[in-house]
Amino acid sequence: MTITAIDAFITELASQATTKSLFNPFRDERLANNLKLYFNFLIRTPVRLAMIGEAAGHRGCALTGMPFTSPETLRDSRNPFFASHRERMFRQGDIFEPSGRWVWGVADAHGVVPLLWNALPFHPHKPGEPRTNRTPTRTELETGEYFLGRILDIFKPEVVVAVGKKAEQSLGKVFPDLAFHAVRHPAMGGSTLFKAQMADILKSFA
């Protein structure tokens, strides 16, 4: 993978329109740059772990440009990526995202910098209510599946984990022959099971 490939991917991502119920954070150059810094860090070594979620959330990726990553994570995480890039990243506010805390917490506990992505890389919300989340439509997920296919083809992670049912369905559709793990999404009371399932998957990462 090359920096040119990263630039082309992010440029195409940023070209997608924002609508009254679907926000594209990557149209903001500051958030697109956060993602670029993250991807450029990941290409230095083979990616061992990818975790795929459902969609960008209003407390996380919609504010930072990074899946499962809130402004609080940008500010406080001790992960090697944030420790080395924090001063170069754009941060707005200090809000936290529970799912992001759990995902990065698992990664940090096992000493990995994961490739984080979403089945839908944009933020679906109620019309006119950007500070809400909603379940993505099938049509939206089909758009997201194009980018999902590209990102996994580019990084070729060793282990792929679907976080939640929507991610599991999209991965199965895009990569029908891919052997991947499926775990409970940590939201809505699923954090304990999520952490246990991830610990089992990542035993070899110690």
Tell me what each language-model feature is.
Residues 177-206:
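Short, flexible loop segments at boundaries between secondary-structure elements
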